[in-house]
Design a protein with these regions (language model features):
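Activation segment signature within eukaryotic-like protein kinase domains
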Residues: 133-134
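Conserved N-lobe ATP-binding subsite of Hanks-type protein kinase domains
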Residues: 36
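AlphaC helix of the eukaryotic protein kinase fold
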Residues: 58-80
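Protein kinase catalytic-loop region centered on the HRD/HxD motif
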Residues: 138-157
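AlphaC helix of the protein kinase catalytic domain
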Residues: 111-125
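Activation-segment/catalytic-loop signature of the eukaryotic protein kinase fold
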Residues: 92
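Conserved short submotifs of the Hanks-type protein kinase catalytic core
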Residues: 96-110, 114
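Flexible N-lobe loop architecture of eukaryotic-like protein kinase catalytic domains
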Residues: 30, 73, 81-85, 98, ...
Length: 181
């Protein structure tokens, strides 16, 4: 399920940075029953910084073997999907008893929020923009559906929650499908 459907979304709340492995969690984006999502930074030499999104299993869910397996499967599936229209998983691990995965940070909004804001203003999404978003998302989904192993065996990856909350639009106009879990 997507952030909007399984998490209580919050506008990113600035928080005191929390060190979490090599990441510094700087904003809490959403909290759900099973996991929480943060905007995070890494710091390198010479002032080099990178933004990521870290999805971390809540402590009480780390004992749930079925959920941990689903989380591991999400990480494995998404890690093999390298496409311009899919949010890339860049790291997966365990710190203490908590599993996490780190993804590229898409600076923008999800389509659900865009549609809600337009509705509040009694406006419609321009047809050309709607078609563009749908076509770009379809490119990412098509890549996932056609993904195969090096031996040519189809992986049969299907996104189980294609919804506006899982289609992200960057401020630069990039469209990316998120949350293959």
């Amino acid at each position: 399920p997507g952030v909007a459907s399984s998490y209580r979304a919050s506008s990113a709340r600035t928080m005191a940075p929390e060190s979490y492995g090599k990441y510094f969690l700087i904003d809490k984006i959403a909290v759900g029953v099973m996991a929480e999502i943060f905007k995070a930074k890494t710091f390198g030499h010479g002032g080099f910084e990178n933004l990521f999104v870290v999805k971390r299993i809540l402590a009480h869910m780390s004992d749930n073997d079925q959920f941990v397996q689903m989380f591991l499967d999400e990480a494995r599936v998404t890690a093999v999907l390298q496409h311009a229209n899919i949010v890339r998983v860049v790291d997966f691990g365990k710190i203490g008893t908590n599993y996490f995965l780190a993804m590229d940070c898409v600076e923008g909004k999800d389509s659900k929020l865009i549609l809600r804001k337009l509705f509040e203003r009694r406006k419609m999404l321009p047809r050309e923009f709607a078609v563009y978003i749908a076509m770009e998302a379809a490119k990412g989904l098509d890549h996932a559906h056609k993904k195969s192993t090096n031996m040519g065996q189809m992986l049969q990856i299907v996104h189980r929650d294609v919804s506006p909350s899982n289609i992200l639009v960057s401020y630069a106009g990039e469209v990316k499908v998120a949350d293959f879990g």
